[in-house]
Amino acid sequence: MKNRNSKICTSLFVLCLIMHFAALAQKKLTVLANKPVAPVAPTMWGVFFEDINFGADGGLYAELVKNRSFEFLNPMMGWKELKQNGKGKTLIINRGNEKPANPRFARITVDSAQYGLSNEGFRGMGIQKGKQYNFSILAKKGDGNINVMIELVNATGKKIGSTSLSNFSGEWTKQTASFTTTDTAVKGRLNVLFEGNGFIDVDMISLFPQETWKNRPNGLRADLVQMLADLKPGFIRFPGGCIVEGRELQNRYQWKTTVGPIEDRMSIMNRWNVEFRAPRNAPDYFQSFGIGFYEYFQLAEDIGAEPLPILNCGMACQYNTGEVAQMDQLDPYVQDALDLIEFANGAVTTKWGKVRADMGHPAPFNLKYLGIGNEQWDEQYIERYKEFEKNLQQKHPEIVLVGSAGPSPNGPRFDYAWKEFKGSKAGLIDEHYYQSPEWFFKNATRYDNYDRKGPKVFAGEYAAHGKDDTVTESKNTWFSALAEAAFMTGLERNADVVKMASYAPLFAHVEAWQWRPDLIWFDNLRTVGTPNYYVQKLFANNKGTHVIQVLQDGKVLAGKDSIYASAVLDKTSGEVIIKLVNAATAPTSYEISLAGVKLNKNRATIEVLTSPDAYAYNTLDQQKNIYPVQKTMGIKGNNINVSLPPMSLNVIKVSIR
C-alpha cells in the first residue's frame, strides 16, 4: 500500500511538473511589428542638467581653482596664505563700477621674500601624472619687480609640477604658462608664490587640464561629457532646476550675465549653498558661470541633442521666498526670452546674434524649444506664463513653449495647471515625479488614458527614491532603477503623448552633494554610471522610430505577473527592439512571435541588466556591480524563446526585412 501511494505521489508530482512547464511554455507574446502605432520623437530620451551637487563648478567645468576671482562672499574662501622667510600680505580691493561684473582683485605685497597663496580646489584638485596643465592669471604690475612661481603639490605637499611667470606689464594683462605633471594626486593644491620686492595686482587665477572635451581651451571635463555623449540624448535641458528661480528674484539665473568674455561674467552664490543644513550645506558653493548659455548650446550641439533652455518667469522659488515680479514689471523677463531666441538663432547682424558670433559660433544654434519657469504653480504662475506666451507666439510662433505642471505628479495644483494649459498654446507640459519605486511600478500605465488631443508631456524630472545606506552612492539601488525601467516602458508605449523624458539630477560629486539619488557620480578623477544610468542608456540607445504593440492575450503587458513591456520599430536600422522588465524574484519564460514581418537573420541579440540583490549599487571603486551584458539568441521561424532573469531589464533586437 505504501509503495502504491508512493507511486501515486510520484506520478502526481511529475504531472504537476509537466503542467507547470507546459504553463510556462504557453506564455506567449505577440509583437505587431508591421503596425506602427505612433512615431517616437527624436527628443524622447534626454538629459537634465542643473548646477547642484557641484555639477558645474567642481564638476563639468574643468576649472581646478575655486574662487579664482575673489568674488565669493568671503573673498579669500578657498585660499590660504603661504609665508616663507619674510613678510607679505594680500589686500582685497573692490573697484566697484569700474568693473561691476568682477569688481574684486587681490593686491599682493612682497617684502624682499617669498609670499604666496594656496588654493584648495573643489574638495582638492584631481591631477593626472604626465598630463599638461595650463595656468593663467590677469595681472598688473605695481611698484617694484615681482616674479611668480606656480606649483602643483599633492596632499603631502610634494611638488608634482611647476612653472614660472615674469615681466608683468603696468596694464591688466593675461599671462599664461603650461607644465607637465610628474605624479597623480586625488587632492592636489595650487601654490602661487610671489618673489621680489613691491606689489602686484592679480585676478582670475586659473588652472585647467589641457585635455578637455574636444580639447577646447578652458573647457569641459572630458570624462563627464563622454558619459552624456554615450547616452545619445535627444535633448539637454538647462540650466535647471531650482537655480533658474533662485531663493529670491535677485538670486535668479540671468542668462545674459553668463555669456561673453569669462572675466566679464558675474559670479553669484549658488542657491544650493544654503538650502540644506550640515553635513549637506555648502558655504563654498558659487556659480562662476564658466559654463554659461553659450557653453550649454555648444554642448548640446556636440552631443547631437536639442537645446532646451528654461528661463525665469518672474517668480522666485515658491518653497523659499515665493516672491514674484509685478505684472507691470514683467517686460524685462519677457525681453530676456526674446533676446535669447535672437542669441541662439539670430543673424550675426542682430545685437545678440553678434554676441554669439563674437564668441566663436556665427552659425545659429537652431533653438526649437523654450521652457517658461521651472516648477511653478497656481494662479500667479499661469498669469505670468500667459504673458510670455502672448509675446512669444506673436513674434516667434516657431518656438515650442514648455509650461510647468508644478512639483508633484497629482493633486490640486497639478490638476489646475493642466486645466489652464489645455486652452493654451503650450506645446509641452513639464511633469515631475520624485517618488518611491512602488509608485513607478504602479504608474507604468499612467499615460495610457491621457488626452491624445491636448498638450504633449515632458517628463522633465523623475527618479525613484528608495532605500539607502551610509555609502554615498547607495541611494541609486538596482530596485529603484528597475522601477524606473518599468515606468519607462509606459512612457515609450505612449510616445504619441510623451515627447521628452529626463532623469534628475544628472551629476553629483561624492564629497559635495546636496541631493541624491543622481544619475552619474564622480570624484576629482573618476566617474561612475549608476544602475539608473544604464537603464537610461539602454532606452536611449534603442529609441527606434515608431512604437509597436507588445500584447499578451490581446492586451498590453504592464504589470501582469510583474512583467512590463514596450517595443519599437527602427525603420532606419531595420530592427524591431523589444524591452521587457521582469520585476519578479523568479525567472519567467516567453515565446515571442513577431507578426507581419520577416526576420533577416536567424539570430537576435539581447542585452540584460540585472542583479540578484535588489539593493545593490555601483560605486567609484566597484563600477560594474550592475552593468549590461549582451548575448545572442536563436530564432525559430518568426519566434524567439526568451527566459527573463529575475529582477531584470531585457532589450531584444531583431533584424527584419
Listing of model-derived features with the role each one plays in the protein:
Residues 138-143, 180-182, 541, 581-583, ...:
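Solvent-exposed strand-to-loop "edge" motifs in beta-rich extracellular domains
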Residues 26-288, 306, 321-331, 338, ...:
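Extracellular and organelle-lumenal recognition/adhesion modules and their flexible linkers in secreted
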Residues 47, 137, 232, 300, ...:
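Conserved, mostly hydrophobic/aromatic
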Residues 195, 209, 239-242, 313-314, ...:
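Active-site groove signature of glycoside hydrolases
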Residues 390-393, 397-400, 418-421, 427-542, ...:
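Catalytic-core region of carbohydrate-active enzymes that cleave or remodel glycosidic bonds
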Residues 595-621:
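Solvent-exposed beta-hairpin/edge-strand motifs
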Residues 164, 561-600, 606, 650-653:
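Carbohydrate-binding surface patches
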Residues 1-28:
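Bacterial Sec-dependent N-terminal signal peptides
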